[in-house]
Swiss-Prot record:
Cofactors required: Mn(2+)
Function in brief: Catalyzes the conversion of oxaloacetate (OAA) to phosphoenolpyruvate (PEP), the rate-limiting step in the metabolic pathway that produces glucose from lactate and other precursors derived from the citric acid cycle.
Reaction(s) this enzyme catalyzes, per UniProt: oxaloacetate + GTP = phosphoenolpyruvate + GDP + CO2
Provenance organism: Acinetobacter baylyi (strain ATCC 33305 / BD413 / ADP1)
Protein family (similarity comment): Belongs to the phosphoenolpyruvate carboxykinase [GTP] family.
Example GO molecular function: manganese ion binding
Protein name: Phosphoenolpyruvate carboxykinase [GTP]
PROSITE patterns: PEPCK_GTP
Gene: pckG
Residues that hold Mn(2+) according to the record: 225, 245, 294
Subunit details: Monomer.
One Gene Ontology term from the biological process aspect of the record: gluconeogenesis
Length: 609
């Protein structure tokens, strides 16, 4: 039996007993209690360089930065192997994979038996959210992957201080992770151990996470999607708050008025770019600051406003397409201390990916560690960077405020070639929830599967809601009602809800809207709507701006182009709204009646387009 040897700074008997129990099951060669120190980080990096898991990059150009190349079979989240094992199947709902908890436990007990043989088990303590915040949650991840241990140090508040908050009897979310590649004595390890069989399992009632077979980010960094969205959304439903797949940004106008906006886009629809937006020419005196680029935890305040924190401490961003033109703030964030995964590397040890520069450098080594072949992808489409959020030049002064920041508006948007206009404002909270619930987006490389097919991705939470999606819609409706009453009493208002689509195409298939920094023009109109000073036209699908309602200083974007991306087609909208029935039927009896009623009203309204 492996010695647990808990250090003095761990004073939590229940935690120590749990580590003992998991060690008994997984049988690691040794146990290491992570303290989050610089020394520990460097030691684990050096260990991975020696093992061939990582390589040091050019330290002049990329100080403190390293590259890991994963196994080609382990490159993205595996939605078909992700389970919500609630006690009752109907509590997981039709959009989640479900297995009876006792069946799954029996299966996992068999798989985890001896799964860490020959490896070190790392005990990784982490806080999602600022340490000690009333919105934060503590997790402990037991993993046999040093890649996970070093990545968690960037993505969460990881280290000794977590145990001070935890004390002797604090609550924590238990997370168990294995790459599922036990080593027999004397057996040589591979650079990226993983297993063709994969399970990412959540038990919402007992707040446990078990992950088997994958070393990749979203499947292995269990504080991220697993805790911060799937488990946290189930907690939020019980406790009256929201865990959302949203960026949070602050907008300050030249008058000094500041608003915080939370926005939900599916993966690879530009969340990180939008969160770090740089205002374009014509917007001197405006400022955009970043609170978070991926996840928001939102709790109602006593004043009836909704307050959000970014539970993460780092960015785990998609590298391809990122460059000094599309996201200068992000590129500046990557100036040092980055862990890259599945990008290409130049012969002098610099990183490269599609979209970083027009010219492909000569003698590239691709993400599989082989010489790059022209016409093939040098970096994997889902290649990532992992970096501390504090390095971002646009980071908001309040990004770690334990009380959170007050949200003025929610934005929902997907990747649609037609139908959905550039921007529209919902008529009211119920209408906004309907629009978010029926969001559609063309599929991308961030999930394994087909590309270019429109799938419904409610609230951009389809892969991340930890309970029945119909109950999730109901939770949004109920929360709106409760918070709305509180807000009214305090003289405040519920956040406005907007829909955007940066991705409309013309007849030749080209994007019409320039996007990136130009999205500031849409953001300004939204802020002015919140402040009650911008015009809008009422249409069957919401309030929309005219060409004259937007600020075009510094650009020659024409009225014809604007009309092209804001036009509403009666036939397209009838097809669109009728297609929502498929999702609603899938959700069955638990679907809130208010949404079905809203669908009927919309169907009648769009006949008038």
């Amino acid at each position: 039996m492996t010695q647990v040897n808990a250090p003095e700074f761990v004073r939590h008997p229940k935690l120590i007993a749990w580590v003992e129990e998991i060690a008994k099951l997984t049988k690691p060669a040794k146990i290491e209690w992570c303290d989050g120190s610089d020394e520990e980080y460097q030691r684990l990096i050096d260990l991975m360089i020696a093992n061939g898991t990582m390589q040091a990059l050019n330290q002049e150009k990329h100080p403190g930065s390293y590259l890991a190349n994963s196994d080609p079979s382990d490159v993205a989240r595996v939605e078909d192997r992700t389970f919500i094992c609630s006690e009752k199947q109907e509590d997981a709902g039709a959009t989640n994979n479900w297995e009876a908890p006792e069946v799954m436990r029996a299966k996992l007990n068999g798989l985890f038996d001896g799964c860490m043989q020959g490896r070190t088990m790392y005990v990784v303590p982490f806080s999602m959210g600022p340490l000690g915040s009333h919105i934060a949650q503590i997790g402990i991840e037991l993993t046999d992957s040093p890649y996970v241990a070093v990545s968690m140090r960037k993505m969460a508040r990881m280290g000794k201080a977590v145990y001070d908050v935890l004390g002797t009897d604090g609550e924590f979310v238990p997370c168990v992770h294995t790459v599922a590649a036990p080593l027999a004595e004397g057996q040589k390890d591979v650079a990226w151990p993983c297993n063709p069989e994969k399970y990412i399992v959540h038990y919402p009632e007992t707040r446990e996470i078990w992950s088997y077979g994958s070393g990749y980010g979203g499947n292995a960094l269990l504080g991220k999607k697993c805790l911060a969205l799937r488990i946290a959304s189930a907690m939020g439903r019980e406790q009256g708050w929201l865990a959302e797949h949203m960026l949070i940004l602050g907008v300050t106008n030249p008058k000094g008025e500041k608003h915080y906006i939370a926005a939900a886009f599916p993966s690879a629809c530009g969340k990180t770019n939008f969160a770090m937006l740089i205002p374009p020419a014509g917007y001197e005196g405006w400022k955009i600051e970043t609170v978070g680029d991926d996840i928001a935890w939102i709790k109602p305040g006593e004043d009836g406003r909704l307050y959000a924190i970014n539970p993460e401490a780092g960015f785990f961003g998609v590298a391809p397409g990122t460059n000094t033109k599309t996201n200068p703030n992000c590129m500046a964030t990557l100036h040092k201390d980055v862990i890259y995964t599945n990008v290409a590397v130049t012969e002098d040890g610099q990183v490269w990916w599609e979209g970083l520069s027009k010219e492909v450098p000569a003698n590239l080594t691709n993400w599989k560690g082989q010489p790059h072949v022209a016409g093939e992808k040098a970096a994997h489409p889902n290649a990532r960077f992992t970096v501390a959020a504090g390095q971002c030049p646009s980071i908001d002064a309040d990004w770690e405020n334990p009380a959170g920041v007050p949200i003025s508006a929610f934005i929902f948007g997907g990747r649609r070639a037609d139908t959905v206009p550039l921007v529209s404002e919902a008529f009211d909270w119920v209408d906004g929830v309907y629009k978010a619930a029926t969001m559609g987006s063309e599929t991308t490389a961030a999930a394994v599967g087909q590309q270019g097919i429109v799938r419904r991705d409610p609230f951009a939470m389809l892969p991340f809601a930890g309970y029945n999606m119909a109950d999730y819609f109901d939770h949004w409706l109920q929360l709106g009602q409760q918070v709305g009453e509180k807000a009214e009493a305090a003289g405040n208002k519920l956040p406005k809800i907007f829909n955007v689509n940066w991705f409309r195409r013309d007849a030749e298939g080209n994007f019409v809207w320039p996007g990136f920094g130009q999205n500031m023009r849409v953001l300004e109109w939204m802020i002015d709507r919140v402040e009650g000073r911008a015009n809008a036209v009422e249409t069957p699908i919401g309030y929309v701006p005219t060409y004259e309602d937007l600020n075009w200083t510094g650009t020659d974007f024409s009225k014809e182009e604007f009309d092209l991306i804001t036009s509403q087609s009666k036939d397209q909208w009838i097809t669109e709204i009728e297609s929502h029935t498929e999702l609603f039927n899938k959700l069955g009896e638990r679907l809130p009646k208010a949404l079905k009623e809203r669908q009927d009203q919309l169907l009648q309204a769009v006949q008038k387009i």
